[in-house]
């Protein structure tokens, strides 16, 4: 039924399923990570520091996205997605062992970076896989993930 509703062609079936699943897990990890980030931060710091954290996130994202854009130009987006996924996993594992003091605000900012980068890279990869005509049919299904 979904195949006929979205007019998914046989060659598109596997990429659509993988991207649907991937987006589901990105959203799941983002929601879970943000809740955990907020809880850990608010246990150790007063809520009045949250606006400062939002500012740090914005400044950090401007710097990192500019750096990423310069260094990723002309590179394989899927490979970059895999590499950043490995880096994110290793750093999250490291935070488990050092999550105290100044590492808590750093963790707050880092979770937001991971969330934004994961979504951004997902759509860059997805845009490389499908042309604009396919995207009009398929993206609504993928977004439902």
Identify the residue ranges that each predicted region occupies.
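Pair of pore-lining "gating" transmembrane helices in MFS-fold secondary transporters
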Residues: 9-40, 109-110
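Hydrophobic core of transmembrane alpha-helices in multi-pass small-molecule transporters
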Residues: 20, 24, 102-121
């Amino acid at each position: 039924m979904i195949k006929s509703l979205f007019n998914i062609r046989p060659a598109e079936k596997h990429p659509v399923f993988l991207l649907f699943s991937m987006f589901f897990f990105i959203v799941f990890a983002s929601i879970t990570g943000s809740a955990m980030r907020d809880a850990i931060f608010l246990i150790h710091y007063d809520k009045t520091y949250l606006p400062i954290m939002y500012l740090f996130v914005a400044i950090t994202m401007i710097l990192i996205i500019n750096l990423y854009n310069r260094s990723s130009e002309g590179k394989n987006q899927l490979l970059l997605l895999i590499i950043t996924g490995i880096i994110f996993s290793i750093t999250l594992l490291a935070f488990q062992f050092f999550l105290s003091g100044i590492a808590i605000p750093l963790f707050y900012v880092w979770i937001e970076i991971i969330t934004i980068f994961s979504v951004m890279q997902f759509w860059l990869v997805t845009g490389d896989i499908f042309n604009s005509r396919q995207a009009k049919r398929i993206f609504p299904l993928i977004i439902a993930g």
